[in-house]
Amino acid sequence: ATPDGTCVRDYVHVADLARSHVAAAKRLAAGTPIAPVYNLGSGTGLSVREIMSATSRVTGIDFEPGINPRRPGDPAVIVADGSLAARDLDWRMRHTVDEMVRSAWEALRAADSAAPHETKDSL
């Protein structure tokens, strides 16, 4: 079970992921051994409802998400233990959930404004 009944997942900002790749590449280039796999995450995760609350807060759009039952076989909680990446790569998440949502929202708005829009005359 989860605190609010929705699945908990570990969300990571793409910039934080990119920093981990750079840190690993620098270690490899220096000839320093690294682990074959690094899990990247907060170790705690956020529920789907918490992500939806952050989305509403950041975008200013008030909405009530429709929450469906968990799919068969879908784990209630999946989070990553980033302690190995912290130790070897000095990696930690820097971005908060609000920053992640804001970044995604701004990218979506920029892509939408750059896309050609149909007009009545072009139909």
For each feature predicted by the language model, list its residue ranges.
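C-terminal substrate-binding subdomain of Rossmann-fold SDR/epimerase-dehydratase oxidoreductases
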Residues: 1-123
